[in-house]
Amino acid sequence: MLTIARSLYEKIIEHARKDHPDEACGVIVGPIGSDTPTRFIPMQNAERSPTFYRFDSREQLMVWREMDDNDEEPVVIYHSHTATQAYPSRTDISYASEPQAHYVLVSTRDESETEFRSYRIVNGEVTEEPVSISQLSPGGRPPYPRNDPPPIRVPSKA
C-alpha cells in the first residue's frame, strides 16, 4: 500500500494538470528503507510529449546524486497519461528499474476528474496497490487545520 501525505498527493495532481497536454513526471524521495515519501521533486519531461516521458539525463543524475548524499531513495516515481487510463504501458513497464518504488500514474484525459493509481512493478510484473491519503505532513506532523482526505478521483480546477 502507498501511504502518501495529502500535500504530496495534491502536488502530483497539480504538476500533471499544469503540464497537460504533455506527460508530467517526477519523483518523491524519502529516507532509505523507510517506504515514506517525504520530498517532492518535479522533473522535466525531456520528450515534451503527450504520449511518452523520459527524465532529462542530466537532471536525473543530479537528483540521484542528491539522494545519495542525503541517504534517500525514490519512494514514488510518477508520471501522467494524458489520453489513456492510469495504467502502465508496455514502455512504462520496461523502464521500471526501481523495484522498491511505488509507480504512480495520473490520468488527465478527463478534465472533470483526475485518476490517481499506484503500482508495484517488479521484473515486468505489474501489481496495483491501494492508496491511502494521510493527514500527516511529509515530515509526519498533523497539518493545521485538519481536513478530511480527498477521494482518489479529484474534480478538475477548470
Language-model-derived ranges and their functions:
Residues 1-74, 83-158:
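Conserved beta-strand-loop surface patch within small alpha/beta domains used
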Residues 80:
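Metallo-beta-lactamase
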